[in-house]
Amino acid sequence: MEYMTESTDRSPGHILCCECGVPISPNPANICVACLRSKVDISQGIPKQVSISFCKQCQRYFQPPGTWIQCALESRELLALCLKKIKAPLSKVRLVDAGFVWTEPHSKRLKVKLTVQKEVMNGAILQQVFVVDYVVQSQMCGDCHRVEAKDFWKAVIQVRQKTLHKKTFYHLEQLILKYGMHQNTLRIKEIHDGLDFYYSSKQHAQKMVEFLQCTVPCRYKASQRLISQDIHSNTYNYKSTFSVEIVPICKDNVVCLSPKLAQSLGNMNQICVCIRVTSAIHLIDPNTLQVADIDGSTFWSHPFNSLCHPKQLEEFIVMECSIVRDIKRAAGAGMISKKHTLGEVWVQKTSEMNTDKQYFCRTHLGHLLNPGDLVLGFDLANCNLNDEHVNKMNSDRVPDVVLIKKSYDRTKRQRRRNWKLKELARERENMDTDDERQYQDFLEDLEEDEAIRKNVNIYRDSAIPVESDTDDEGAPRISLAEMLEDLHISQDATGEEGASMMT
């Protein structure tokens, strides 16, 4: 015999709330949600209104105990800062969600919506949503306070070079811009023989000094002065000064090495030409094309000076030029330059064209010179050389003329220059009238030497039409592939996307 069983739907049982008697599903507390919320407030102890400090000058928020950070409105960084203000009472509950409630940017109010959970009576978990109101209070940070009080810098770097030309400083300026080493500076001041960099902390100044040691041959001395002290907290306030001295050698200088240094560099001749100054001094012997690099420590151990300054450059015309194919190398000689060609030339001063006086010399510019070309050089035969190493040399080993570079029409080169460079924002005082000519010399060096401009950001000048890489005279030019577009990306006052805090 078979029995038919009826399928029955099971429904959960209900109980009555012990407070109000409303039928509810069973729970560990045996109480409805409404009554549980009326009896228990899990947000109790969490402040509903908190103040937060904001500096109007630098657009930064104060993060205890002593840090100022830059945050955009409704950003993750600002939300983390707001939650840290209530970190202690918030640790008693479980934070489920947090987010901003939109407010007017100028209202000086920040509202954060929090969702928290907490275990209450008999293991029941209660979830609650509430809003914390943050009042933005204006407070000037310590850095801005020192700026307004004209006592803002803690460290200064005084960069000096004892030369009559600023080619090294122009190159150093472009390296600073390329690698962004000027971002932490408070002020940059230019004087007639160097630059002063002001910083708000000694650590930033030390980082800049390390950068200078990696980019130019130099040495430095550090000193500090006590400004104030607090005997109760045992704190001291110092101002630090870093005196950086760059080697007094620039590109296109003619130098005379000491016999000991010349021998250590591969028995090269003492009279050399400086073809480049980077982290080391790059020299070339115009008689043999032998090259050598001298770092800062070697220079200060065996110092030498420039025999002539740029204002003593004279213009010569090439009368005859022949390439020297067979270069005799002495025993123990150093490296030979592959970018230059040794040539023997007869030249005559353009100021002495009415005479028959000509000069014979060897030069490293044999690949550039042809009869009739103009070239700039130093006349060592008719100038007074006041150098201890030259005075001890045999007069037969001192050349009459040292050629430096080929001469082109400067006006035409400026007119066809379709690129530009950026400059550091700095204060200037006691500027020389010769600065513009020196800057044009630096721009010409960039066009002529690819090794110098590879670490320089060159921007295309849209106002000048694009032409060929060389002009009618054969003057070198920078190709369009080496140029960057000059972009101007604007940011809001907070430094990121989002509305700015209006005060």
Curated annotation (Swiss-Prot):
Record's keyword annotation contains Endoplasmic reticulum: no
Modified sites of kind N-acetylmethionine: 1
Keywords carried by this UniProt record: Acetylation, Cytoplasm, Nucleus, Phosphoprotein, Protein transport, Transport
UniProt keyword rRNA-binding, yes or no: no
A GO term, aspect molecular function: ribosomal large subunit binding
Protein name: 60S ribosomal export protein NMD3
Residues recorded with modification Phosphothreonine: 433, 470
Pfam family, one: NMD3_OB
Annotated InterPro entries: Nmd3, Nmd3_N, NMD3_OB, NMD_SH3
UniProt main location, coarse: cytoplasm
GO CC terms: cytoplasm; nucleus
Complexes and interactors: Found in a 60S ribosomal subunit export complex with RAN and XPO1. Interacts with XPO1. Associates with pre-60S ribosomal particles.
Gene responsible for this protein: NMD3
Gene source species: Pongo abelii (Sumatran orangutan)
UniProt subcellular location: Cytoplasm; Nucleus
Sequence motif Nuclear and nucleolar localization signal, location on chain: 405-422
Chain positions found as Phosphoserine: 258, 468
Region described as Necessary for the nuclear export of the 60S ribosomal subunit: 425-503
